[in-house]
Each structure stands twice: as structure tokens, then as C-alpha cells.
Amino acid sequence: MEALQYLARRLFLLFGALFTLIVALFLGLFTYRPDTAPKHLVTDVPETTPWEPRDILAVWDATDPLVQQGYRLVTESSKYMGPGAASEDLRYTGNNLSCTNCHLIGGTREGSASWVGVTDRFPQFLGRANEMSSIQDRINGCMQRSMNGKKLPEDSPQMNAIVAYMEWLGSDLPADQMETYRGYARLNIPEVPVDLDRGRELYARDCAVCHGQDGQGISGPDPSQGYVYPPLWGPDSYNDGAGMHRVITAAEFILSNMPFGMATRGTPRLTDEEAYHVAGYINSFPRPHKAATEKDYPDLKLKPVSTPYGPWADDFSAEQHKYGPFPPIIEFYRENYNLTKTK
């Protein structure tokens, strides 16, 4: 009997211990929360710096003299190849603008027709000449129109230096950044014509502080040496054959860059419609005339819809080609010529 009692006690203790173990196990399962944070799996990743164009002034002493000269020519154009040049044979530009009055920050500013990577896009077809064109051809287009001057000889020291500077700017441009530095921001073209009164108000609010109420800009100590802020119309501005004389092109430039120091390609200060109206206002004033513009765009279908001078391959008025509305003209070319126009 005592042996049976002893065995019963032992079994009771055994089952009690087993029961306690099972309870503890279930409690553990229900309350367990695994640590999901990885341990020692992530290694330090070095920070990457976004690509930016090189600053020539920061590496001036180590830069090829030809590139240095190109920089001087585009940033002090009037002094070295314009009215301020030392001798008559060096005077190729007809006004006191600098190339960098439009191609901002030494041609490095995205959204201002930057030169970063531009030489890699040439030769290319240009509708104005209706042929494949070189970078030298494109530069001379600006010389004759925006700079209101004459062509640089293609093999001249000035041309070679300007091209060398442009090539230097894009020499290490990553392929995935090519489009970033191309052209201007795309304008959402308004459905309405330019409102010159609204443009005047916007100009007074946002532009006159730098360019003057009379649009004649602010020159440096010696006017023949260029401008701090360029004139936007009048005898020392771009001529009427320049791309900037087209309302859509001017509006795209304004959208990304003006007011200067406040707007960028990604963060414009003005709305699309405000940029459009002020561009029309600026281009409503007299400026130098470019001879023989009727020969531009031999294939008239390729002429931008906002080109303010004829002839055109349509029956829209000169007034509408200058001030809009442009969507009906764009639609005409889409329906009749299967062409998609953006400017």
C-alpha cells in the first residue's frame, strides 16, 4: 500500500511539472514578439552628390586657355567681339548683349537653353535652314539674330574658343542628365490671345526692378562693356528674327528663369499664362529688324506657329501668329500636315 501511495505522489508531481511546462510554453508563444530589425545586415552607404556642371572659375588655373577664352567671349561678348572690341575687325555682334544674358550662369543653368551637352546634339536638322546643321551654324544663328550681328568665320579663333568652352561644359555629363539641360521648360499654351494690359501689369510687378520701366536694362559702368540686366526691347536688344521674339519661346524662358534668382525650371514663380502675357508685352515693342526673314524656313510647314513674320503655310493672320491664340493654329497643322507643334 505504501508503495502505491509513493508511486501516486511521484506521478502527481510529474504531471504537475508537465502541466506547468505546457502552460509556460503556450504563454510564451502568445506573448512572443520577434525582433524584426535586421542586425548587422546594412552596411554604410556612401552619400552621393547630385551631378552639377563644372564651375570654370573654381578651376580656372587648371583650365585650357582656349576654354578660358571661350568663357570670356560668351560672358563679355560686347568687350571681346562686339561694339566694345578693340578693333573693327573683331566686332561681330551688333549690340552690347552677352551670350550669357540668355544662356544663364555661363550657359550652365537648366531651363535657359543650357550649353551643357549641347555639342553632343549636333549635327542636327534645323528647320530654319531646312538642312542638317553644325554647332557652328547654330552659334552663327544667334550671332545674326539675338546678337544682331554677323557670322563668325567657322574656323575663326572666336568660334573655336566658344565651341571648346561648350564641349568642356558637357565633357563629363551623365547620359541620364542630358534632357535636364536641354532647352526650356514646356509651356502649357493658353487658349487665349496675349493680353497686353495684363502683360504690362506683370512687367511692372516682376520685371521693371531689373530691366527698367522703359525696358532698357541696367548697364555696367561702361555701357559698351555690356549689361548687368539686359534691355528687352529697343535698339540694343535682340532683333525681330531672333527665337526670343516668338511669344511661346520667350514665355518658356521666362517661366523657368524669371524673376531672376527666384524662379527655376522646377519651381517657377509665374504661372504659364502670366509668363505668356508678359512675353507678349515685351515683344510688342520696336526692336532691330533682321533682313531677309522671308527666306527662313524654306519648308513653311516647319515654321513655329508663334513666328511673327510671314510667309506661313496657313491662312491665319499675322496678328494671331504674333499674339495668339495659338491652339487653333497648332490644330490646323495637326489635321492638315500631321505635325505636332509645340512652339
For each predicted feature, which ranges?
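Gly/Gly-Pro-rich "capping" loops immediately C-terminal to redox-active cysteine motifs
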Residues: 83-136, 217-259
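Short acidic alpha-helical/loop segments enriched in Asp/Glu that coordinate divalent cations
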Residues: 177-181, 213-226, 264-266, 293-295
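Sec/Tat-exported extracytoplasmic proteins
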Residues: 74-81, 103-106, 142-150, 166-173, ...
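Electrostatic cytochrome c docking/interface patches
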Residues: 48-90, 171-204, 217-219
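Active-site/pore-lining binding-face segments in mid-to-C-terminal subdomains
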Residues: 234-299
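The canonical Cys-X-X-Cys-His
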Residues: 70, 96-107, 162, 199-218, ...
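N-terminal export/targeting leaders of redox proteins
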Residues: 1-83, 124-140, 144-157, 170, ...
